[in-house]
Amino acid sequence: MADLLSVLQDKLSGKNVKIVLPEGEDERVLIAATQLQKTDYVSPIVLGNEDNIKSLASKHALDLTQIEIIDPATSELKDELVDAFVERRKGKATKEQAVELLDNVNYFGTMLVYTGKAEGLVSGAAHSTGDTVRPALQIIKTKPGVSRTSGIFFMIKGDEQYIFGDCAINPELDAQGLAEIAVESAKSAQSFGMNPKVAMLSFSTKGSAKSDDVTKVQEALKLAQEKAEADQLEHVVIDGEFQFDAAIVPSVAEKKAPGAKIQGDANVFVFPSLEAGNIGYKIAQRLGGYDAVGPVLQGLNSPVNDLSRGCSTEDVYNLSIITAAQALQ
């Protein structure tokens, strides 16, 4: 994790990227905000009831003098954001509904990002994934050419660094969806200083098994390679289909996939389903001893990321750094 953060901090030096932290009344978030404010990487915007936040700061002896605090209930920005929300959600929300929704810190924070008053958002310490992601999908939406967002995890142990996806968002994926995730994961890898070698995973290696599931991954590989070329991605390798051992162990790749572009040296792994991805990252985390950083959401027009409700202050800090780096892409 230290190596990844060092790369990102070098990239962010002097940028003071504005990141919204909607859960300012959570002590983990508020402590992380004060730590971030001491850097020149991130300039946090904290949301919540100002009196409650100041009381929490006093309890933990935190200095808030340089931190921007916004209370959605009383903010002078509320009317502007309500109007922008109604316009964005044409025909899907009345002004009265917008006023009520923007009392919610996640909707308010997402509108700050949408209107350019902030560059990214990190939430989830006290909210579900749905509470964090839903406003982003409704307001920020996905990039042109991308039909869905997806969630990757950085799996880190010592000098080893891998990306696993999709592990968090899409329960059902067709070949087109897998292809999009492969290309977006490659872009994410590049933005975090990696040279992506993307393995499309299956229970088959290069046609060793036959089934509709294998065919889907094979079709996804072709679509991903075409999309990477159309997007003019350089220094990106996407290959498959591979069993996991053939993707990561050179001696196995030599036997199972001689001549493949990836010879046991993949660093980005695209799982064939959410089930497989979620199980896979947790096995690597719990049995393999890897730190799992994420989920980092990709495919949105602006970065929004989701914390676990069991997160630590360090998790909030680290994901804020990652979100700021995404904002510079």
UniProtKB/Swiss-Prot annotation:
Its EC number is 2.3.1.8. GO terms for molecular function: phosphate acetyltransferase activity. Pathway: Metabolic intermediate biosynthesis; acetyl-CoA biosynthesis; acetyl-CoA from acetate: step 2/2. One of its GO terms (cellular component) is cytoplasm. The gene is pta. It catalyses: acetyl-CoA + phosphate = acetyl phosphate + CoA. It is an enzyme of class 2 (transferase). Keywords: Acyltransferase, Cytoplasm, Transferase. The keyword Transferase applies. One of its GO terms (biological process) is acetyl-CoA biosynthetic process. It comes from Staphylococcus epidermidis (strain ATCC 35984 / DSM 28319 / BCRC 17069 / CCUG 31568 / BM 3577 / RP62A). It comes from the Bacteria. Pfam families: PTA_PTB. Belongs to the phosphate acetyltransferase and butyryltransferase family. This is Phosphate acetyltransferase.
